[in-house]
Amino acid sequence: MNKKLNEVLLKLDQDLIKCVKGSLDLEISGVTYSSKLVLPRFVFFALPGIHFDGHDFIEIAIQKGSNVVVCSRDVDFYSPNVTYIKVDDFNIRKFMSNFSNIFYDEPSKKLKVIGVTGTDGKSSVCYYIYLLFKKKGVKVGFISTVFFDDGSGSLIKNPYRQSTPESTEIHSFLSTMVKNEAQYAILESTSHGLDLETARLIDVNYFAVVFTNIGHEHLEFHGTIQNYLNVKLGLFRSVSDDAGFGVINLDDLYSSDFKNAVKKSFTYSLKSSKADFFVSFIDEKTDSTRFEFYHKGVKYLANVSLLGSFNVENVMAALILVSQILNIDIQDIVDKLNCIKSLDGRMDSINLGQNFSVIIDYAHTPGAFSKLFPIFKRFATNRLISVFGSAGERDVEKRFLQGQIADIYSDLIILCDEDPRGENSMCIIKDIAKGIVNKVENKDLFFIADRKQAIEKAISLAKAGDLVVALGKGHESSIIYKNREVFWNEQEVVKNAILSLEKSEKEK
């Protein structure tokens, strides 16, 4: 895609631009904030950051062919034939989003964009909506923590560490969806992505939105639960189309706030018959869940190959969204729920014939812990052994809560790394341990920072009928430390630990 720089700038808020040095009569062919991704005639945004400053990479970007640099401070050397656009630090991400949106011809206006937000369940709800659309033969694109689909029908793993990519990638991906003739786009809309400070989603035109729940997460970024809530409410307030609507979990404490933030909404509940969709009965099996729900006085019977009442909530959100946006009969969607399957790293059972069970799950919040641990306890015919950590440079307050919940249900706990980043691993572990009051260190509570060794310890301690749960990583392919990122595959680590145990037992 090629555009004239001046044509793009004419459509932007001129008040955001402090000054321009160089020609505006330039052809540009792309937009990026990463010097690694720069190609000839790319606009390079020098974003300030916590660990890296884009201004330090301006020369590299120019060497690779960038002919336009957007910066928030004066640079040491101005290259001829390069245009420099200066904006405020605070506005540079907003300007990048505005610029990307215009450069890619406002792609979200050519799609019906569905945003899913909440503390827990976002990725699963996005995936279930995607699967139901596909089952109905609808062309759809998809951006989530785990998977992407650019509208071509092919799922790829999310290539970014962020659930919601930067605005340059969002609008580029939406543009590709338009080219691939997708009708709908599903966006996992995180609080980081929705926040005005990151400005990743501010130029996305949403048609329908889903709210799952609010819990204790990301307060290191938002400061207070009210700020966190307001960011998510902003998504609902952004729905301007008269035909647009919201889908809301009525069981959440903040559901009324979300109802008030959107003109039209549909609610679902596992507790209240006042909801538009009320789940009145749930029967959990070891490999599936059967449930019934009512809508406008009509009873529907459904069955899914998923575990847990929390997944019934997720399925209901997807079912309502798809039936309403496509304006089709509820029973039509109920009949197609057999297409729904578990997302990678969610309630992922590892069975190599061992006499104990192992489940891997991405759960990393107190809310997710409170929903999953009762299920784990029911599944464990003997002891429950839990392996988990908590993210470094993230919400510190949740660590105590994670430990507290795990302590109630677990027989043994092994604390380890999740993503320590720049924090000391043992400091994080001890923060979690403050919530664990019913365990004794080195008896039924172990501190093993190395996650591989922690999992191996759990597997070595497992006896017949035990359930080992490894939480917090799920599908993720790396562990982040201060100055390095280490490849990680939880499934392979667990499998290797089981095989090593079996080998050592045979050699005895």
Curated annotation (Swiss-Prot):
EC number(s) on file: 6.3.2.-
This protein's name: UDP-N-acetylmuramyl-tripeptide synthetase
HAMAP family: MurE
Family indicated by similarity: Belongs to the MurCDEF family. MurE subfamily.
N6-carboxylysine: residues carrying this PTM: 232
Post-translational modification: Carboxylation is probably crucial for Mg(2+) binding and, consequently, for the gamma-phosphate positioning of ATP.
Enzyme class: ligase
Disulfide bond annotation, renumbered to this chain: none
Superkingdom field: Bacteria
SUPFAM superfamilies according to UniProt: MurD-like peptide ligases, catalytic domain, MurD-like peptide ligases, peptide-binding domain, MurE/MurF N-terminal domain
Location of the protein in the cell: Cytoplasm
UniProt binding sites for UDP-N-acetyl-alpha-D-muramoyl-L-alanyl-D-glutamate: 35, 163-164, 190, 200
GO CC annotation terms, alphabetical: cytoplasm
Binding, ATP: 118-124
Statement: the UniProt record of this protein carries the keyword Nucleotide-binding: yes
UniProt function note: Catalyzes the addition of an amino acid to the nucleotide precursor UDP-N-acetylmuramoyl-L-alanyl-D-glutamate (UMAG) in the biosynthesis of bacterial cell-wall peptidoglycan.
Gene Ontology MF: a single term: acid-amino acid ligase activity
Primary localization class, coarse: cytoplasm
Keyword Protein transport: no
Record Pfam families: Mur_ligase (PF01225), Mur_ligase_C (PF02875), Mur_ligase_M (PF08245)
GO biological process: cell division; cell wall organization; peptidoglycan biosynthetic process; regulation of cell shape
Pathway of action: Cell wall biogenesis; peptidoglycan biosynthesis
Keyword annotations of the record: ATP-binding, Cell cycle, Cell division, Cell shape, Cell wall biogenesis/degradation, Cytoplasm, Ligase, Nucleotide-binding, Peptidoglycan synthesis
